[in-house]
């Protein structure tokens, strides 16, 4: 699949820390580099996602992330999905340290970069987009997340749910 443009994936809920001026500055940097910019968030309206809509919603987000050249996000799951999809990503601190902590786990992936200061954005974009190796090695994923994946599978089995 040919990748085109960039995506901002910022919080828009009550935990949002990014101010409008900074978001506009990020948009301007991305527009100057990539031309086409999309905006998205992982939250779509109030309430919970219905079980029958979960897979479709995940697929839509994965497809969106897989279609762009670069993502700038303050969302933990956005950064993780970029790692899985091989999408260059610059992750911003959001005050909750979750993104920064996970960024430490992913620091060996050259196409994922965590920054605290927006002044580092240009260099970070250069760095992640120039990385030639864009995949998360499965053995590394298994060793880091194997116990969690097994726990999830055990819970699904106990609840009578089928695998994914």
Regions found by a protein language model. Name each.
Residues 1-164:
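Active-site anion-handling motifs in enzyme catalytic cores
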